[in-house]
């Protein structure tokens, strides 16, 4: 009587396990990249919202309000990245949390710069900066920023 053995040999099983393991490692790497990307996008979204909130507050001030004063003259172009020492105003609550307050995780710094008579006479150019940092492996802290310019008229 002729009987054929059925099933897999140990070598076939090991090769299958190795291939499955390589595939799972790739999926894990993709998951880590997705989580990192989502975190980065969330931080940028919050920073943009904080900058926009500050612009709205500044737009509601009178044209002569001290928060719209051009303290450091001739600093319309602050360079890239801007020199923080040349920026006119800092949020008094710095560092701030996701809502602009001081009760949560305070990871953002908010500044704004005013340039009188830019780009034309009688107009103020307002640029709001929001900075935050992320830990970047062995390289340490990576600084990020959102910069939103607008103009203010009397």
Model-derived regions, located:
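Aliphatic-rich helix starts adjacent to a transmembrane/signal segment
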Residues: 4-52
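Low-complexity, Gly/Pro-rich coil/beta segments used as flexible assembly/activation regions
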Residues: 42-154
């Amino acid at each position: 009587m002729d009987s054929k053995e059925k099933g897999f040999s140990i070598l076939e099983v090991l090769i299958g396990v190795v291939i499955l393991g390589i595939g799972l490692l790739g999926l894990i790497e993709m998951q880590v990249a997705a989580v990192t990307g989502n975190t980065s996008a969330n931080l940028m979204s919050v920073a943009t919202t904080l900058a926009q909130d500050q612009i709205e507050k500044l737009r509601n001030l009178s044209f002569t309000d001290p928060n719209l004063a051009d303290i450091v003259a001739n600093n319309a172009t602050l360079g890239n990245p801007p020199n923080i020492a040349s920026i006119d105003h800092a949020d008094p609550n710095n560092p701030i949390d996701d809502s602009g307050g001081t009760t949560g995780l305070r990871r953002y710094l908010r500044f704004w710069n005013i340039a009188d008579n830019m780009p034309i006479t009688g107009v103020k150019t307002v640029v709001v900066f929001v900075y935050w940092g992320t830990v970047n492996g062995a390289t340490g802290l990576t600084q990020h920023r959102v910069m939103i310019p607008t103009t203010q008229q009397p």
